[in-house]
Amino acid sequence: MIEAPYLWRDAAHMTKAGSSPIFAKMNEELVSRRGLRMLAITYYGKRHLTTGSKEVRSAADMAGFKLRVPPVDTFRAMAEAWGARATPINFNELYLALSQGAVDGQENPLPTIHSAKLAEVQKYLVLTGHIITPRLVIANEAALKGLSAEDRAILDTAIANGAKWQDAELSRQEGDLIGTLKTAGMTIIEPDLESFRKPVLEQLPPKFEEKWGKGTWDALAAL
C-alpha cells in the first residue's frame, strides 16, 4: 500500500514513515512471510499524467479516457475513480500502445517519462502528482543476521547516506525534467488537483481497508 495514491503528503512524509512503529510492524510481517527486511524507503518522484491529444485540466476531463495503468488493483481503482477506462498494459508494451492509440495516455514519474522517450508519443504533461513513488532497499534477513556488528553498522550507514543522496538527486532531476520535457515538445498543464484527489480519497481507503488492515491508512496518513 505504500505506493497508494494520495497516501503521502510529500517525500519527507514518506521517509518519516520508515522510522514509525507501524512501518516496523509491516517490516516484521515481511520478515515472517518472505524472509526479507526493508532497510530504507527512497524517493523516486511524483507520478504525473501524460496524454496524447486531449488537454486534461480536471478529473472531469477523464471521462471515458483510456488510461494505461500497471496491472495493479490500486492503480486500476484510481483510474476508475477519475472516471477513466483503466487499461492494464505491461511497461515494455507502453510506447507502442501510445504510438498506435491503443490508449489515450499514461502516468509515471518524470524520470521514467523521460527515459522511455514518451514525449515522442505524448503531447501533454499534466502535473497531477497523484503518487509519491517509493523505492525500497530490501535485504535477505538471514544474510543480515550473518553480518558482524561492525559490518552491519557499515551497511546501515551506507544505506542511510545513499538514501539521502537519492532523495536529493531525484528532487533535483524533477525540477530539471519539466523543462527538458517542455523543450522536447510537451505542453505542461497545471490541473485542478483537488478534482483528482477527492474522488480517490473517497473511494480507495474504504475499498482496500480489508486488504491493508483496518486503520493502517489513517495511521500512515497521520504521521
Predicted regions mapped to residue ranges:
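N-terminal secretory/targeting leader peptides
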Residues: M1-H13, I22, E28-L223
